[in-house]
């Protein structure tokens, strides 16, 4: 079993795009990435040969724009949202749940880079769908 990521590690890479299937075909053909559709969503999970797993999905309502967002593992999304604002960052979304997996919030650093916080649900650590700790 691989070592679990430590807080502060990038644990997920996400492509926010208008046409997910085009992106999947592009990266799959170039690099051999395998994509697994998530039932009931315009979203697929992928794994590259190494590095963090990721996702490709259609744009979501609200503060979502085309681009790539890296997810950083934290012990508490709530605590880090406060710390980000105190450090001069901006919170772009409320804390949201990925059912059965964990919670996230989008933020922007003082230079304008968009990133996300990820808090793993401890109950999900031993499930087959857990791609953030294996």
Model-based region annotation:
Residues 30-35, 88-90:
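Conserved acetyl-CoA-binding loop of GNAT-fold acetyltransferases
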């Amino acid at each position: 079993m691989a070592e679990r990521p430590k807080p502060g590690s990038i644990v997920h890479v996400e492509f926010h795009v208008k046409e997910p299937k085009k992106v999947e075909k592009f990266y799959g053909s170039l690099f051999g990435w395998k994509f697994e559709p998530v039932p009931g969503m315009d979203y697929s999970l992928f794994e590259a040969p190494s590095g963090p797993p990721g996702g490709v999905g259609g744009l979501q309502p609200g503060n979502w724009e085309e681009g790539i967002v890296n997810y950083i593992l934290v012990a508490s999304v709530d605590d880090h949202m406060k710390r980000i604002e105190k450090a001069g960052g901006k919170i772009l979304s409320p804390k949201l749940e990925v059912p059965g997996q964990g919670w996230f919030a989008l933020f922007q650093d003082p230079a304008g880079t968009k990133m996300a916080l990820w808090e793993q649900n401890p109950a999900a650590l031993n499930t087959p769908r857990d791609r953030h700790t294996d």
